[in-house]
UniProtKB/Swiss-Prot annotation:
NCBIfam families: phosphon_PhnN, PRK10078.1. It comes from the Bacteria. It catalyses: alpha-D-ribose 1,5-bisphosphate + ATP = 5-phospho-alpha-D-ribose 1-diphosphate + ADP. Its EC number is 2.7.4.23. Belongs to the ribose 1,5-bisphosphokinase family. It is an enzyme of class 2 (transferase). Pathway: Metabolic intermediate biosynthesis; 5-phospho-alpha-D-ribose 1-diphosphate biosynthesis; 5-phospho-alpha-D-ribose 1-diphosphate from D-ribose 5-phosphate (route II): step 3/3. Keywords: ATP-binding, Nucleotide-binding, Transferase. One of its GO terms (cellular component) is cytosol. The keyword DNA repair does not apply. This is Ribose 1,5-bisphosphate phosphokinase PhnN. Transmembrane segments: none annotated. One of its GO terms (molecular function) is ribose 1,5-bisphosphate phosphokinase activity.
Length: 190
């Protein structure tokens, strides 16, 4: 059995990563070869937000101290972790999709050299509009996030780009195609 592939989805907050991953999860629900990893975050669960596991700071510290995270990082005052279960899934031949961090990508590549980064891109105007609509940031924070998104340089290594300015199903089908192609090529070489 060949090892699965790790897909590390990145993009600015408001680019639609959560919606895109939810679309992919629903479309590939019957495919045992593709697994979407949940993040562990020190943030309460929101009704229309990311499907994550909410942890307190103490819970996060305890999991970190016992080595339960394969990947972990801090961003915007929150802490994020990806459980070590992804290693089992990869070893079993599953392709694993996770919501990552642009800043943490070099460390993720060091730990998982074969990972494929998927950059979800949107125009600055669409990004600002989406951030305003979700209502979590002030205008100053929105301006800083848009500026940061413009400054992001494409990283070294394998990178797929998905434009997510249009209807969700367009970008969603692109993600499904990337994951399905990887699954098909893995089966061809098994």
């Amino acid at each position: 059995m060949s090892e699965g592939k790790l897909f590390y989805v990145i993009g600015p907050s408001g680019s639609g990563k959560d919606s895109l991953m939810r679309y992919g999860r629903e479309r590939l629900a019957g495919d045992p070869g593709v697994v979407f990893a949940h993040r562990y975050i020190t943030r309460p669960v929101e009704l229309h937000g990311e499907n994550h596991v909410a942890l307190t700071e103490d819970e996060f510290d305890a999991r970190l101290a016992t080595g339960l995270f394969a990947l972990h990082w801090d961003s915007h005052g929150l802490r994020y972790g990806i459980g070590r279960e992804i290693n089992l899934w990869l070893a079993k031949g599953c392709n694993v999709v996770l919501n990552g961090s642009r800043e943490y990508l070099p460390e993720a590549r060091r730990r998982y050299p074969g990972l494929t980064a998927i950059l979800v891109n949107v125009s600055p105007e669409v990004l600002a509009e989406r951030l305003r609509a979700r209502g979590r940031e002030t205008e100053d924070q929105i301006s800083r996030r848009v500026a940061r998104a413009k400054q992001f340089m494409h990283p070294e290594g394998r990178l797929e780009v998905i434009a997510n300015d249009a209807e969700l199903h367009v970008a969603g089908e692109r993600l499904v195609q990337l994951l399905s192609d990887a699954d098909a090529s893995k089966r061809a070489f098994a």
